[in-house]
Structures are given as C-alpha cells and as structure tokens.
Amino acid sequence: MATEVSTRFIFIKIDALSTLHFIDEGGALSMNGDSIEFLIGKSSLDKGLLKRATKLFTWLFSPEIAKQHLSITRSTESNVYMTDATRYKYIFPEYLLVRYVGTKFPDMKIVADATFKRRNPKGDVIGMLDLSFKEVRVKEVSETKAIELRDSNPGYLLSTTYRESESLPVVSKP
C-alpha cells in the first residue's frame, strides 16, 4: 500500500445540482464545510472515506476555488415556501482534474441529497439550499492520463493544487 506523499492527479466526474433560494441576504445559505459534510454523510460512503471526501469537496467548493470552475445563473421565482425569491442555480462542470499532493486517493462514488432551510423568527422560510450529488465519481489517475485529459480539454485542470495536509488552498503556477 502506497503511503508516500507525492504529486498526483484526481479526476472527478460530476453529476450534481445545487440551487439557492432566498428572500433577502439574511436568508442566503452557502455550500460550506458543514453543509458538505452533512450531504456526504448521507451517502453510502464507507466511514473511513467520509473525512477525506468532505475535506476534498469543502476545498473544491470554497469561494477561492469554486470561482475557477462554477458558474451561477440568477433569476427570480416563487416556490411553495417563498414568493419572489432570488434563485441562484450553480452550474457544475461535468469533469474536473485536480493536481493533488498527498497519499494515494481512493476511488469514490457519492450519491446523496440534502436540503437546508433558514427561517425567520416567525418561522417563515427565508432561505433554502438544495444540494444533490446525483452521481459524483472520484478517481486518481496517472500523470500520463492526466496529460491526455488536459490536452483533450484544458478546462478540466484547476490551476490550484489540492494539498490534503493543508486547510487553505495554495495557488500553483502551471
């Protein structure tokens, strides 16, 4: 079993949905460590993988990293909980390639759904975040395969390196 820390590559296939509805800024919720941990905790992942998956996706959806790969559409709509709510729909890329410094990363398949609601003191819903990992797959790939993937679509590769031993992203120069 390889426990050597080295530069590796993780290929992530993402089939996910996320929408945020809120009435005012006080109702806005975000994808953060707590919501991601809750979402991934609802999956069938082995307990030993939960911490690694949570850390990876918390990093991936942190604001400084997410701006590299997520896009957001904004609209106004009503739903059963809120009238004329602002709606943000997060558009995930289908694939991501992440440069990674750490030990061998296990293959993972994550399927999970979670909804978070924020209420005002009267009990009315003023914010709602829906997260759905319809099917998210994580697989470590060789450097040769990573180069092939990058060459086929340069947009797959994030410009930031994920370092599992650190809590903050480190920007690397390509």
Curated annotation (Swiss-Prot):
It is found in: Virion membrane; Host endomembrane system. The keyword Nucleus does not apply. It comes from the Viruses. GO terms for cellular component: host cell endomembrane system; membrane; viral envelope; virion membrane. It is a peripheral membrane protein. Keywords: Apoptosis, Host membrane, Membrane, Viral envelope protein, Viral matrix protein, Virion. GO terms for molecular function: structural constituent of virion. Coiled coil: none annotated. Plays a major role in assembly and budding of virion. Completely covers the ribonucleoprotein coil and keep it in condensed bullet-shaped form. Inhibits viral transcription and stimulates replication. Homomultimer. Interacts with nucleoprotein and with the cytoplasmic domain of glycoprotein. Most abundant protein in the virion. This is Matrix protein. It comes from Northern cereal mosaic virus (NCMV). The gene is M.
